[in-house]
Amino acid sequence: MSGSHTPACGPFSALTPSIWPQEILAKYTQKEESAEQPEFYYDEFGFRVYKEEGDEPGSSLLANSPLMEDAPQRLRWQAHLEFTHNHDVGDLTWDKIAVSLPRSEKLRSLVLAGIPHGMRPQLWMRLSGALQKKRNSELSYREIVKNSSNDETIAAKQIEKDLLRTMPSNACFASMGSIGVPRLRRVLRALAWLYPEIGYCQGTGMVAACLLLFLEEEDAFWMMSAIIEDLLPASYFSTTLLGVQTDQRVLRHLIVQYLPRLDKLLQEHDIELSLITLHWFLTAFASVVDIKLLLRIWDLFFYEGSRVLFQLTLGMLHLKEEELIQSENSASIFNTLSDIPSQMEDAELLLGVAMRLAGSLTDVAVETQRRKHLAYLIADQGQLLGAGTLTNLSQVVRRRTQRRKSTITALLFGEDDLEALKAKNIKQTELVADLREAILRVARHFQCTDPKNCSVELTPDYSMESHQRDHENYVACSRSHRRRAKALLDFERHDDDELGFRKNDIITIVSQKDEHCWVGELNGLRGWFPAKFVEVLDERSKEYSIAGDDSVTEGVTDLVRGTLCPALKALFEHGLKKPSLLGGACHPWLFIEEAAGREVERDFASVYSRLVLCKTFRLDEDGKVLTPEELLYRAVQSVNVTHDAVHAQMDVKLRSLICVGLNEQVLHLWLEVLCSSLPTVEKWYQPWSFLRSPGWVQIKCELRVLCCFAFSLSQDWELPAKREAQQPLKEGVRDMLVKHHLFSWDVDG
């Protein structure tokens, strides 16, 4: 066929042969034979060009230079593959090369120097892990296409609208009759079917179209699968775009670190960089750089993953940093930033600058920042996340295609994570809603019982700044230096120098010089009273309220132990790994014990942290430094000591610990401590659990509301009452009365 061949560097020559538009090639041949000028010219990638474009002074040098394969570079690649697989030259064929290539510095240097274009389809599949996915999949691409062909969903309709918008200047996708359009439709519909929680995103369309230019349809699909599941974080292409939004925050953090002058400029002009760079990341540069540069970027991207997106973006910004700094106004800066990708013409220069500037950036550093900023982003939005959304934060979930395990297998080895995810994530929104309602009920109780709490703001603060203030507020002790006590019994006033009070009255202590008789004030009167008739209040960081005292207001006990504690327990039980058939107990208390111990041990192991604690955290009554971690550890130990003595159940222990956290106003900080103990959380919880998802930050913000109220809850409220002799109290009072008659009391202290 006359149109079946295209010369090197000629139209469509860089594309996979199966996507060559034969009708256009046939017309080219006819025009050449008749010496007529063709209606349009196309480059080797199928993009429409104008013959005189190369003569224009503003045209791109990169666009006008033909794609030439470097013969020595191809030989180096062949030598590496032969050496790695120990084959003779004549025996080396792609079917004999492993589905994944062993990673090494040599391989990385080859990738960085560029993959020979003719080897890209096979090497991309191996570097990205797509070939492994293709061979291991239980469903073939043909079956996936068949299942998705009749899928008349919203995603399918949107795909149909965007087919001609994706790459209109390319002959393979220019019209509904173009050869690439049916391929793109099948790939996008297959992806939307396989990843129902993602559906369709325009970013996937651009990436898929570029892949289809160089790979066969099935291989392009599995490349997209590798990008979605492995190379990019979860939620990159979801409706919320949480993944790519998070990466924009990570990018701003990296700019502060690597390009401080540019960071200062962006802050001075109040420029939101994500408005420009989000599209770069969403399409992996497919829609913003020249196709020749894109090939070099993707060589590295498929080998090293999403870290490359940050490195190259930093490199681009660095190359234009001086021009940006010299810009006169915000509009000029914004326009310059927007034009940066299209002005990148030297691939070697860009890659060299990017690696010199940010080559030290590691996946661990990127993932650490992602985890933090994703959690803050979710909390900042202040939204109740649905089950599907929360699921997609930790991993991309495929449509279930595996057969269900047998009952015996499930008992011995547990259910599949996906099966458990499907069954349990349905209630996530309900769990958060139940907790929020429990918190509001407690808050309304305080406002109704004690009017001074009416001004407390009950709307959670989801801002990033709120997390920074948490520890500052924890460190700050009570600004009121009053020492107060609560009356345990009625004390009737008989003399002018005595202070009478009723049970549960709050007395301001003036003097504690005597062991038995203290001096205090109540309602403007000052006098002495029996010390054993009162209980000193812990008001280091709060002001006592009868609404939170379970010895005065019984209703608070029902609200806390009967409503709030079960709601919190349900969250801690969500995704808790169940024991095997021969396993032991499974309860959130066991996780809390282990996490508290691990965190406090980590602090003790750090000499530096011990040195700065005195400047960072408040002191307890003994003058000892207590971090939130240490306070949690002590509380757990205290609960164990008192509750084990009466063989209390773990449910009771958990409720008592929550009461201690409310008393100390640190319940939200304790949740942060527990969820930050990653090894322990991963040991006890499934990947889809609430505590392993960034959703815990939202719960922390909800719990923070409770630290605005003063609780005085008994840790041992559910334990059997102890029989205490009343004689010591009477003897103490008798001693006090003797002293009163023998000595003259100075009630002025």
Curated annotation (Swiss-Prot):
Record's keyword annotation contains Methyltransferase? no
Which is a Pfam family this sequence falls into?
A: SH3_1
Q: Where is the SH3 domain?
A: 480-539
Among PROSITE patterns, the record links this protein to: RUN (PS50826), SH3 (PS50002), TBC_RABGAP (PS50086)
Q: In which tissues is it expressed?
A: Widely expressed.
Reading the lineage from the top rank, the first entry is Eukaryota
* Phosphoserine modifications at: S406
CDD domains per UniProt: RUN_SGSM3, SH3_SGSM3
Any one cellular component term from GO for this entry? cytosol
Q: Which UniProt keywords apply?
A: Cell cycle, Coiled coil, Cytoplasm, Growth arrest, Phosphoprotein, SH3 domain
Instruction: Name all Rab-GAP TBC domain ranges.
Output: 114-305
Q: Per the database entry, which stretches of residues form a coiled coil?
A: 415-439
Biological processes annotated in GO = plasma membrane to endosome transport; positive regulation of GTPase activity; positive regulation of protein catabolic process; Rap protein signal transduction; regulation of cell cycle; regulation of Rab protein signal transduction
User: Where is this protein found?
Assistant: Cytoplasm
Q: Where is the RUN domain?
A: 555-718
**What this chain does, per the record?**
May play a cooperative role in NF2-mediated growth suppression of cells.
Stated family: Belongs to the small G protein signaling modulator family.
Summarize the subunit comment: Interacts with GJA1. Interaction with GJA1 induces its degradation. Interacts via its RUN domain with the C-terminal region of NF2. Interacts with RAB3A, RAB4A, RAB5A, RAB8A, RAB11A, RAP1A, RAP1B, RAP2A, RAP2B and PDCD6IP. No interaction with RAB27A.
Q: What is this protein called?
A: Small G protein signaling modulator 3
**Which taxonomic lineage does the organism of this UniProt entry have?**
Eukaryota, Metazoa, Chordata, Craniata, Vertebrata
Record gene name: SGSM3
